[in-house]
Structures are given as structure tokens and as C-alpha cells.
């Protein structure tokens, strides 16, 4: 992977351990261009979509990170680096007694100097809540890797419906885990989906900056 890519973006999808290691089905499901379906496979094709990318695929990501590659995961996709041990002491959590219909809420940036936030003028900005594990539980060793947290409280709900907003106060939703695996590589994780259905335009730069500045870090902080 590293010979072809510096950065891999894993968009919102189910890549849990169970899904990744799932065996192919007895009956293949092709995704390929045919005379009937001429526009399939324009950006990729496979003779069988069933099953996960398996142990071989996991090992390929492991080698990618050990070689200094950067993995960016959003929403449910963060389960992949976390469940396979590529994210150090970062784990997912879903705060109790919170009900929300994807409202806009306030977030606070923990490190304004981080390249992910290039172009952001204020430390507090609006974000789309939901579409993932919602928050991260971060170990002491990675506290300084937290990039942003929820402000929390009903006053932080800018639009939409949300009960229990006080229960997300101070919870981390963006983390830069580096070095990520065996002292190498980088895993940038967003518990929300910064590119949800082309709606939350103000958050797109979180992903763009992560890609463009994959090998940069705040001044004085080393990157492998």
C-alpha cells in the first residue's frame, strides 16, 4: 500500500473486526462492468463483493502504518484501527441518556495550531452530531492527542433536536493517534462524519487538511 499511497481515507462504513474477517459467501456477488450494466466498475470492480478483506488485508494496513503511512477514519470506520490495535489507547464510547436526530452542536478545538484546523479562525465551531460511535474514550497516554471535544449542554445545540446534551460535555470526537502502530505511522480519527451527505460544508476542511497535511504536526511536535 505504501508504495502507492501516503494517505488512505476510510469513509463511514462498517469495518468492524467481525465484518473485516467475514468469509466470502457461497454465492459470489460481482461488481463489474457488463454489457447490461455499462457504468458499473468505473472506479473499481471485483468478481465478488461478499466477505471482508481478511487477515491479509489487515496485515497490509499494519505494514502501511509501520512504514509511516497515514490512515484517516471517520464515523463507524474508526472501529477498524481501534479494534485491530492501531489506535494506541483510544476506544469508542456512546454516552448514556443521549437522544439526538443529527443536530448541529458546538465543538471546541483543543489544539488550534494543529494542521487539521488550518483556516479555522475560532476555537469553537458548529458541527454535525452523529453518524458513528459519537465519542472517544482516551487513555492518559493519548490525552495530548485529542484534537477537539464537544462543548456540551443544551446551549451548545444550535439546530435540531437533542436530549441529554449535558452528557457529551468535554467528550473527545477527534484524535490524532501518532505514532500509531509499533512506534510508526499515524491514525487520524473523527467519531462523527465530517462529510455527511454534503450537508456540513464547514467541516469538510477537517478531512481536506488531514489529507493535505498528512506529514505535518504542530510546531515542536514530531511526526514519525
Task: Give a label for each model feature.
Residues 1-87:
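Helical hinge/lid and interdomain linker segments adjacent to catalytic or ligand-binding clefts
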Residues 82-200, 215-223:
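Catalytic beta-strand/loop cores that center a nucleophilic Ser/Cys/Thr
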Residues 210:
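Active-site beta-loop-alpha substructure in enzyme catalytic cores
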